[in-house]
Amino acid sequence: MNYLIVISFALLLMTGVQSGRDAYIADSENCTYTCALNPYCNDLCTKNGAKSGYCQWAGRYGNACWCIDLPDKVPIRISGSCRGR
């Protein structure tokens, strides 16, 4: 029984756990990407490893790109001010 637990744990560590999140993609200054059309955001999001993306109109940060299943390594908009604009 203990062998089964150890083997299961080892397999979990070897395969790794990847998580994604749905969020506004941000640049290095904590600013969202302004958009008008969905194809722009979908292209931006998928190039950064997300499954898809679209332009969120009149959202919390205005018209900004929203990504679906964005990898953890990609910066997202967090609370606080946009430092670049």
Swiss-Prot record:
Annotated disulfide bonds:
C31-C82, C35-C55, C41-C65, C45-C67
Q: Specify the domain of life of the species encoding this protein.
A: Eukaryota
Tissue specificity is:
Expressed by the venom gland.
- Chief location of this protein? secreted
Protein keywords:
Disulfide bond, Ion channel impairing toxin, Neurotoxin, Secreted, Signal, Toxin, Voltage-gated sodium channel impairing toxin
User: Which terms does the UniProt entry file under GO BP?
Assistant: defense response
**Can you provide one Gene Ontology molecular function annotated for this UniProt record?**
toxin activity
Cellular component, GO annotation:
extracellular region
Q: What residue stretches are annotated with the LCN-type CS-alpha/beta domain? A: 21-83
* Name this polypeptide is given: Alpha-toxin BmalphaTx47
Origin species, per record, is: Olivierus martensii (Manchurian scorpion)
